[in-house]
Regions:
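Structured alpha/beta or helical-core interaction and ligand-binding surfaces enriched in interleaved
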Residues: 1-97, 104-122
Length: 122
């Protein structure tokens, strides 16, 4: 499957791969937070300080990884900011696996809300 096809499945997330085929290959999954994607889920913890920014997505992703894909914890790294969720690795397949699983979780708002209930505010 091409990256274009993968990215259609992952919208509004975007998978980017840099320097593919070299020692310096790097893959990143990003979500620019310029829309209200799944804001209603984060609003369930608004009184606790969750606002749906990149750091909150980070907190959700950590719970997701711990519970669903613990084998990826050591190979993925976060580089989120207030307006951007970003996770990446030199292991392109690990980023793809995370991306597909994380997007599937986001498509199930009850699962997403459940995982967010265990997230720790950053």
């Amino acid at each position: 499957m091409s990256y274009e096809e993968i990215n259609k499945q992952l919208e509004p997330f975007k998978l980017m791969v840099f320097d593919e085929g070299t020692e310096d290959v790097w893959a990143t999954l990003v979500l620019w937070l310029n829309e209200d994607y799944k804001q209603n889920v984060f609003d369930t913890r608004l009184e606790e300080g969750f606002v749906g920014n990149g750091y909150d997505w980070n907190s959700l992703a950590i719970v997701f990884l711990e519970e669903k894909m613990p084998e990826l914890m050591e190979v993925l790294s976060f580089d989120s900011e207030a307006g951007l969720f970003s996770i990446g690795s030199e292991d392109v397949e690990a980023v793809k696996k995370f991306a597909v699983g994380f997007k599937a979780m986001c498509n199930d708002e009850s699962e997403m809300t459940d995982l967010l209930s265990r997230a720790i505010l950053d």
